[in-house]
Design a protein with these regions (language model features):
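Outer-membrane beta-barrel translocator/receptor signature
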Residues: 10-13, 24-101, 107-111, 159, ...
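Periplasmic plug
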Residues: 1-21
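Acidic/polar loop-and-plug regions of large Gram-negative outer-membrane beta-barrel proteins
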Residues: 83-87, 100-106, 110-168, 173-210
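Structured loop/turn residues at secondary-structure junctions
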Residues: 3-4, 55, 168
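Short, solvent-exposed loop/turn positions at domain surfaces
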Residues: 3-6, 64, 88, 149
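Conserved short-loop catalytic and cofactor-binding motifs
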Residues: 3, 23, 50-51, 150
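Short, flexible active-site-adjacent loop segments at beta-strand->alpha-helix junctions, enriched
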Residues: 21, 41, 119-121
Length: 211
């Protein structure tokens, strides 16, 4: 999952930091290390959790984690998220949502098949900070946005499907995970440079990128 977009934590069990050569197990050439996101899987017990957050700068967020056991060998889990938040910076906001249903089937002892799908949508205004003067942040109002918020949009739509199979063989476990993903991403922003000597003008550069 190498595409550059803002990932959310709503459906993660944990994050593993694999340092040095350990990162090579993924076949990506990440010799310096990688962060491995471990997604939540169905449990063979009931679980129902809902969380709501309200905060400063119009922050609103809700998450849900629902799990159910279906018979003796099947379980399903549904994770969902929605967030809409502002910022201390003028014109900066974000809205994102995600849903991740998963199903686990364990027909035999030592055999487990897990199928999952995730849809994530993220739209926001890119915030590249304030200008600088003489090698340090300029003495300006921190709420100032340099550029045009209407032309600094970041958008991502992500669809990820996965199938994971585990088979115990004696004391060893054989694992195979297949992932198919589709990404629709656009990034555009303005970058403020250093202020002029008279502190009256700021040079702006801009670029965009689509995946």
């Amino acid at each position: 999952d190498d595409v550059q977009y803002y990932r959310d934590l709503y459906n993660l069990e944990r994050i593993e930091a694999l340092k040095g050569p350990n990162a090579m197990i993924f076949g990506r050439g990440g010799g310096g290390g990688v962060l491995n996101r471990v997604v939540k899987e169905p449990l063979f017990r009931p679980l129902r959790a809902v969380a709501v957050e309200l905060g400063g700068y119009d922050h609103k967020r809700a998450t849900t984690d629902l799990n159910a056991r279906l018979g003796s060998d099947t379980a399903v889990r549904l994770n969902g998220m929605f967030e809409r938040s502002g910022s201390f910076r003028n014109g900066v906001d974000l809205e994102r949502s995600g849903v991740n249903p998963t199903l686990t089937w364990a027909p035999l002892a030592g055999t487990k098949l897990t199928v999952g799908y995730e849809y994530l949508r993220d739209t926001r205004v890119a915030d590249r900070g304030i200008t600088s003067f003489q090698g340090k942040p300029a003495d300006v109002d921190l709420s100032t946005f340099y550029g045009d918020p209407e032309q600094s949009d970041v958008k991502a739509r992500v669809n990820i499907g996965s199938v994971a199979l585990e088979q115990a063989i004696g004391t060893a476990v054989l694992r195979n995970r297949t992932v198919i993903a589709g990404y629709d991403r656009f990034y555009q922003n303005f970058v403020p440079g250093a202020a002029s000597a008279d502190q009256q003008t700021v040079a702006l550069t801009a670029y965009n990128n689509a995946t």
